[in-house]
Amino acid sequence: MIERRIGDVVLQLDVGDITQQIDFDAVVNAANAQLQPGGGVAGAIHRAAGPGLAKECAPLAPISPGECVVTDGYGLPNPRVIHCLGPVYGSDEPAAVLLADCYRKALVLADEDGLTSVAFPAISTGAFGYPPEKAARVALGTITEAAAELGNVKVVRIVLYSARDLEVHEEALAEIGLR
């Protein structure tokens, strides 16, 4: 695990399973517009949470790229799930702004909900095709900027799929000055 302090917020980068983030108040779902089970992160979160999650999500859909909504966590070890629709790279524009909106809005929603810890996947880097290097810079830059405004959130973790993804994020940390 890689850890950096940004003011009062601890930023963590780790390889793991987004559905197994024990002791985190919320996990972020890289959702589809209909907030339904699918592949990747959304499928894993819905499988772990159970059918109650899809039932709660149904009236909240659809959401647009860059938007987030909050639900209960059901069978997950987390009380809350923050669902964000990331941009499809090359289709939803401006992609960097929409991706930054996901991270920023999720942190604001968590903070307003009184949550102290949030675990994110690398939003839009799977089926939505966002290049991991570019997505890492947007994610880490946005989290760094947002950290100063957070009152309740004290720990932000990005849960990555592979050691290579961790390397990409570590390089992005250096690029934004968080060595």
For each predicted feature, which ranges?
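Macrodomain-like recognition of ADP-ribose-binding/processing modules
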Residues: 1-179
